[in-house]
Structure formats: structure tokens, C-alpha cells
Amino acid sequence: MTAGTVVITGGILATVILLCIIAVLCYCRLQYYCCKKEDSEEDEEEPDFAVHSRFPPMHSNRNIVLANGPSIYSSPYNKKHQHCRSVCTHHEPPAFLLHPPEEIRNGGERIAYKTISQEEIELPVNVSNLQVLNPNRLSAMREAFSRSRSISTDV
């Protein structure tokens, strides 16, 4: 075998291994979402923050929050639930997803930003502090900058 054949064969083998790993991870994630305890989801009620609060609604099921983050839209889990019952057997969620969520910073409130046009800006207008522009000085500055030329050298 030549070196090129070995490199190509190794690349194909590495690609197949990576695709197998991705397929196994996707299957495990599908099983995890499908095979959760049904009682925990049906018994827990989500608080209705949309009506009573200015904060977005949060899921009460912390496994969904840890895996996907908080979502303000309805979950597609209920539609796929019938299909998952035939595929899955009961198993526990991975241990790395069971850590408690981090604290909410800034008290959990949103920070409002204003643009410059929204803020009331008062400029200090003291005409007495402004200096009168001297025309001689202005022409001297123009000449000083117009005389400067770039010098190029061979490298």
C-alpha cells in the first residue's frame, strides 16, 4: 500500500467512527427525552408567569432546562410521546445533568438600556469659554500638514 492509500483509508475510517459516535449520542438523547417518567411531567404544573409577571415563563422540569435551556415556546415533546413509548425502556438520566442550576445574576431582572437619542443630554453651552478661531493660526496649520509628504524607500 502506498502512503496516499493509507491516508485515505485512515480518513474514511475516522469519518465512519465519528458518524457512529454521533448516531449513538443522538439515539441516547432521543431515549432520554422519550423515557422520562410520565408522572413527573403530568403532576407538575408550570407557574403562569406570562400573566402575572414581566419575566418569561420557566419550565418546572429541570432536566429539560439543563439540557435545552429555558424555553418560552411549547414543547414538541407531547406530539412525539406516542412514538417514544414503543421505542424506549425506562432508564435514569445521565449523572452529569443532575447538577443544580447556577444562580441567577442581577436578581433575575432584565436590564433596560437606552440609546443616546432616548436620554436627555444637556450640553454645556458657555459661549464665553469658547475661543475665537484665529485665521492666521488656521492657515499655518494647513500649511504644516500640506508640506508633510510620505517618503518611500526600497525594501
Curated annotation (Swiss-Prot):
Per its UniProt record, what InterPro entries does this chain match? FAM163, FAM163B
Q: Does the keyword ATP-binding apply?
A: no
What is this entry's stated membrane topology?
A: Single-pass membrane protein
* Gene Ontology CC: membrane
Location within or outside the cell: Membrane
Q: Which domain of life is it from?
A: Eukaryota
Instruction: Kindly report the protein's main subcellular placement as a broad class.
Output: membrane
**Family in the record:** Belongs to the FAM163 family.
- What is the protein name stated in its UniProt record? Protein FAM163B
Origin species:
Xenopus tropicalis
Q: Which gene encodes it?
A: fam163b
